[in-house]
Regions:
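Non-catalytic interaction/Regulatory regions outside core domains
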Residues: 2-5, 16-148
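Repetitive helical segments and hydrophobic/amphipathic motifs
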Residues: 11-12
Length: 148
């Protein structure tokens, strides 16, 4: 084998590894008992409007251990800090989420720390409604009690 061939193989491997690091493999089970998950998906103007609202009012997401997953047509992203930083999710995880929750049109789903769906809406939802839903959960009440 020539040196240039070995160089190309090495370079291809490095590029492959770097590309893999930009995507996060996602399994919702990994969030159980650690985080609440807000999944927003669909391909519509409602999707953008919901994100705009979250961007304005997401400062309390980390206090509520809330992770946001954004599902779009062929691309999904995740944020652990109220959309301040966003990481892409791998394609297989995107397909799994789209199929599991049937994201053909706009939808917002809230999943509790126990892994169960707590709220599901096809309409825009005020972030304060999400906060109220979370704050009414027994586990959240216990968290608030322990912090005080």
């Amino acid at each position: 084998m020539t040196k240039s061939f070995l160089f190309l193989i090495s370079l291809s491997f490095i590029i492959f590894i770097n590309c893999q690091e930009n995507y996060e493999m996602l399994n919702l089970k990994n969030f159980e008992w650690k985080n609440r998950v807000l999944i927003i998906g669909g391909d519509s103007s409602k999707f953008k409007s919901q994100l705009d609202q979250i961007n304005l009012e997401s400062n309390e997401f980390t206090d509520r251990d809330l992770v946001i997953i954004l599902i779009e047509k062929d691309n999904s992203r995740i944020s652990y800090d109220g959309l301040k930083t966003i990481k892409s999710i791998d394609y297989d995880s995107t397909l799994n989420l789209r199929n599991k929750y049937n994201f053909k049109e706009f939808k917002l789903i809230l999943i509790g720390k126990d892994g169960y769906e707590k709220y599901n809406s096809k309409k825009l939802v005020s972030i304060n409604v999400i906060y109220e839903l979370i704050d009414g959960m027994p586990m959240r009440k216990q968290e608030i009690k322990e912090r005080n």
